[in-house]
């Protein structure tokens, strides 16, 4: 009977350690996603502020598309939806930048802010995806995979990079 008690105790310790590790990683992951989301919100805000500066040079369809992207982004939290909107915004802004430069428009402060934002977002994406890798590895590996299935931990979605 003493052996059974020891085995149960060891299993309980392993279970608690695995659960706590997954819980901590989930909290870290949520923190990284929040940080990434805030950077993305700032980028969309920059785009929204830039549009009035170039409004007269952009065709109505492109302007409407950008405004729709900016408005649709607000309130989204799903990683895939957020990534799709982010990359769509970037593609649209490349077109706007080329139109602005072809019309000899220059906004150095805004360009610097937009480029700085891009670097911060890329760093946030890397940090978020690193946390996703850690938690997904735990969900896949024994014995934490058993704990994950019992407690409902599941794999997380990576923020795609293109």
Model-derived features: positions:
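A helix-centric hydrophobic-segment signal that preferentially recognizes long
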Residues: 1-162
